[in-house]
From Swiss-Prot:
Residues 577-591 have a biased composition (Low complexity). It comes from the Bacteria. Residues 599-611 have a biased composition (Acidic residues). NCBIfam families: PRK00290.1, prok_dnaK. It comes from Lysinibacillus sphaericus. This is Chaperone protein DnaK. The lineage of its organism: Bacteria, Bacillati, Bacillota, Bacilli, Bacillales. Keywords: ATP-binding, Chaperone, Nucleotide-binding, Phosphoprotein, Stress response. Acts as a chaperone. The keyword Zinc-finger does not apply.
Length: 611
């Protein structure tokens, strides 16, 4: 069975891993780094992903960052007069990860396990699955990030019974999950979180502080300057990382803007104490979900055996201190917070292929599911933290006499009124026979699959007529849209490959032109005028083809020049070989004619003993 890769599709960075010899291994990107920035940029129609896209983000306004925060919404990103859905942009990142995983493995990759924040709703999960499909991946499983982290952590601890709290603060989302580990069973007891809290918010707090300080000093509002804001974003992210290791950092941005008197520079010293002060409200927001998860699991902090920190933002000292204070535990430091989620996804891939045995994963739905009933009330059918996959049915009736149809409004959330919860979808069960209100029996069944994706069925028990939908929110993509995006992605992949082929060909042609000039110089007078003219004409022809930029023309001119150059190159080699041979011969002769004064000539006389 082909390999199933594990992908942590992150807000700020992404990571890909694969199971090798029973152990998950992180696959480095082409730059040699173990995580890849979740950044996509466009320049003159050319697409860039990862490190190269991030490096030029300050100067390129057509750069997309933190697209994960838009997953599950109908919001689109417009770049170079073209609209892209969050699914399409995420697919570009996935396609890049898939590409370098294939290079590493030396085989085609078609299957993946992709992680999502535990608190992702149905629309966000479906969007992630669609992104995988657009990228040419069969998404075998969507699993929650904290669960994946626990899977990696507990892989070699299956003989120990433990209750583990996973605290996952990434670039854009925050989750807390509590799991029970024992005998190869990884059971999620409860999960809680905040999909609008992450490292980006800590960056924004620093940016707000810098903008306010600069305005106070210079009277200029940098927030109106897009280029300055991008530079501030990069500086804030760097300062945040620096303050995890030092107590003070200098933020220096020369020529940040211009005033009446000329260029202005931003020079501000940011201490860890100040950083802690401006980000305190964000740190405090992590406490509620921790308490909620413990309460839902029916556990006290003393019953937690281990606390695992996941996500780059857990390196912030104030966050670590908040975790210690809330759990009365020193967090476990045996896992890399940037890589553990992808590695856990690879372990799940191994479970699916049968390479990892005796591991059972029991995850939960993070939010309650139900429908709107009379009076705008939210009636729950499946409570949050129910183990999935699961199915639940309940019988409802009509609200009016002779009602011909019922509208089923499917919702996800914890509030008591329907309007305060997240709409997942609506559908109608029609052709209900005329009857007084309360008489028809309408059975509504909710199904949640192993990926946490919801389908709903409504059935008239009197007529056995039923209507089923797989929930698709306003932001969801139809099969036709996904198919179109798959074709676009493949076309882009082909275009990228063609661009690479063209770049490689140009480089080879440039190198060949250089080699011609060097060969002529090396041969000196040994090259005839006819040979010289022939090779120079072919070289000039290749130069013209390079200027014209037509691929087939470059290929033909390159092949012609190679044909003319080959005999001359052989002449250079023969000349070098002859010179080397001559040198060796000279050294041998010199050695033969040299007298060795250490040799003594002597006559020997045989002496016989008389006996």
């Amino acid at each position: 069975m082909s390999k199933i890769i594990g992908i942590d599709l992150g807000t700020t960075n992404s990571c890909v891993s694969v199971l090798e010899g029973g152990e998950p291994k992180v696959i480095p990107n082409p730059e040699g780094n173990r995580t890849t920035p979740s950044v996509v940029a466009f320049k003159n129609g050319e697409r860039q992903v990862g490190e190269v896209a991030k490096r030029q983000s300050v100067t390129n306004p057509n750069t997309i960052i933190s697209i994960k925060s838009k997953m599950g919404t109908a919001e689109k990103v417009t770049v170079e007069d073209k609209d892209y859905t969050p699914q399409e942009v995420s697919a570009m990142i996935l396609q890049y990860l898939k590409g370098y995983a294939e290079d590493y493995l030396g085989e085609k990759v078609t299957k993946a396990v992709i992680t999502v924040p535990a608190y992702f709703n149905d629309a966000q999960r479906q969007a992630t699955k669609d992104a995988g499909k657009i990228a040419g991946l069969e998404v075998e499983r969507i699993i929650n990030e904290p669960t994946a982290a626990a899977l990696r952590y507990g892989l070699d601890k299956q003989d120990q019974d433990q209750k583990v709290l996973v605290f996952d603060l990434g670039g854009g989302t925050f989750d807390v999950s509590i799991l029970e580990l024992g005998d190869g069973v990884f059971e999620v007891l409860a999960t809680a979180g905040d999909n609008k809290l992450g490292g980006d918010d800590f960056d924004d707090a620093i940016i707000e502080y810098l903008v306010a300080e600069f305005k106070k000093e210079n009277g200029i509002d940098l927030s109106k300057d897009k280029m300055a804001m991008q530079r501030l974003k990069d500086a804030a992210e760097k300062a945040k990382k620096d303050l995890s290791g030092v107590t003070s950092t200098q933020i220096s941005l020369p020529f940040i803007t211009a005033g009446e008197a000329g260029p202005l520079h931003l020079e501000i010293s940011l201490t860890r104490a100040k950083f802690d002060e401006i980000t305190l409200p964000l740190v405090n927001r992590t406490v509620g979900p921790v308490r909620q998860a413990l309460s839902d699991a029916g556990l006290s902090t003393s019953e937690i055996d281990q606390v695992i920190l996941v996500g780059g933002s857990t390196r912030i000292p104030a966050v670590q201190e908040a975790v210690r204070k809330e759990t009365n535990k020193e967090p476990h430091r045996g896992v890399n917070p940037d890589e553990v989620v992808a590695m856990g996804a690879a372990v799940q891939g191994g479970v699916l292929t049968g390479d990892v045995k005796d591991v059972v994963l029991l995850d939960v739905t993070p939010l309650s599911l139900g429908i709107e009933t009379m009076g705008g009330v939210f009636t729950k059918l499946i409570d949050r933290n129910t183990t999935i996959p699961t199915s639940k049915s309940q019988v409802f009736s009509t609200a009016a006499d002779n009602q011909p149809a019922v509208d089923i409004h499917v919702l996800q959330g914890e509030r008591s009124m329907a309007a305060d919860n997240k709409t997942l979808g609506r559908f109608q069960l029609a052709d209900i026979p005329p009857a007084p209100r309360g008489v028809p029996q309408i059975e509504v069944t909710f199904d949640i699959d192993k990926n946490g994706i919801v389908s709903v069925k409504a059935k008239d028990l009197g007529t056995n007529k039923e209507q089923t939908i797989v929930i698709q929110s306003d932001s969801g993509l139809s099969e036709a849209e996904i198919e179109r995006m798959v074709k676009d992605a493949e076309a882009n992949r082909d275009a990228d490959a063609k661009r690479k082929e063209e770049a490689d060909l140009r480089n080879e042609a440039d190198q060949l032109v250089f080699q011609v000039d060097k060969t002529i110089t090396d041969l000196g007078e040994q090259i005839t005028e006819d040979e010289k003219k022939s090779v120079e004409d072919a070289r000039d022809e290749l130069k013209k083809a390079l200027e014209a930029g037509e691929l087939e023309g470059i290929k033909a001119a390159k092949e012609k020049l190679e044909g003319v150059l080959q005999p001359l190159v052989m002449k250079v080699y023969e000349q070098a070989a002859a010179a080397a041979q001559a040198r060796q011969g000279g050294e041998a002769d010199a050695g033969a004619g040299k007298k060795d004064d250490g040799v003594v000539d002597a006559d020997f006389e045989e002496v016989k003993d008389d006996k």
